[in-house]
Amino acid sequence: MKTDKNLSYNSQWLVIGLSRNGYDKESKYFKKYYENIVTYLEENNGDITKAKYSVYSKLIISLTALGKDARNINGYNLLSYLSDFENLKKQGINGPIWALIALNTNSKYEIPKNKEAKINTTEEVLIKYILDNELEGGGWALSGTNPDVDITAMAIQALSKYYNDKDYSDVTKAINRGVKWLGKAQNKKTGGFSCMGYENSESCAQVVVALCSIGINPDEDARFIKSGKSPVDNLLTYALKEGGFSHIKGTDVNMMATEQGFYALVAYSRLLKGQTFIYDMSDLNIEKPKKISVDLTANKKSVSSNEKEIVNGSYNKTNISDDSNEKEVKSDKKSDKRNSLDSNEKINSSSKPNEEGWEFEGKEYNLKNPGEDNRIVQQKNKSIEPTPKLLAGIGSMIIVFAAASFIGKRKRVGR
């Protein structure tokens, strides 16, 4: 694969998909991505956004997928940027969803405490917020009272770690309601899914990933077979002969659609192989963080001796020791935290966005024109185009799944 010198944090989905599909982690492509991330963090002193904190979450996911410890990316603890829960909520429910996914990529990850934060972000705070924002009848949305396919699918992905866990029965029930709603939202003729009134590949891709996250085969489960077509069947109808995916049918290759279609197929492939969920990195050997010492006096910031605390409300570099006695986060911590929020940390469950509008999974919604999906206006992400080799590789994977889906379809018809 040709190394793209312009690889940026926006390349995260290709990195996640390729890495979780077994692409060599020592490749020049991944090394260049990591080098560019480090450079970008240094140039911005770690402060790369003031509104879309899911950027940090997705960086954590992609770097963990490469076997990197996100608590020490050249001295930056990326989890610290998720510490102020009010910041996460600027994107509505999207922020907490991706923060929880990022946190659970590595069982050793914890979000440091932030002395300046009104509400410190914790695993339980994130879970509670997502559950509190479930809509009546099941499902989740960015706003309003009607569930949204993409957000419902992503909420299920975020909560999937706790599915069928006796300590999280409320999570299991919420997921089941969400799955039931998705089944009803599926197009009865095409097997696909719509967002904002039109069918598209990304919504279908998110449903495929969501079902895989809880062990449901999206190509065989009877609840998701409509007119003989499954979500996998539908997703493959957006595949183009040059190897990528289109956003909506009849349009050219779209980078976002290609990324999401690709990693959805990777998630499905991993399910079929009995591997961990695409965002569950417990199968990887994560690099142990080395102890570092960083002088932050130039920034008028200080790091306390307690490595898990953030001082002055803005945290970027830490001292993290490679402690052989460091214990993994155990499941028995669940029961005593479900209702243990401090009285001063009551969560505002409103999904009210910041004034600039919401963004999730590349979909940008302008609050002044809430019916406008910017992906219609701008079909391609001009900053990062898929290379021919990448498209060819994805094309090969599509061919394999198309053949498997055809065989599966024949079996379904014969039942």
Which residues make up each language-model segment?
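Juxtamembrane/start-of-transmembrane alpha-helix segments at the extracytoplasmic/lumenal side
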Residues: 381-396
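C-terminal low-complexity, Ser/Thr- and acidic/Pro-rich disordered "stalk" regions positioned immediately N-terminal
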Residues: 285-385
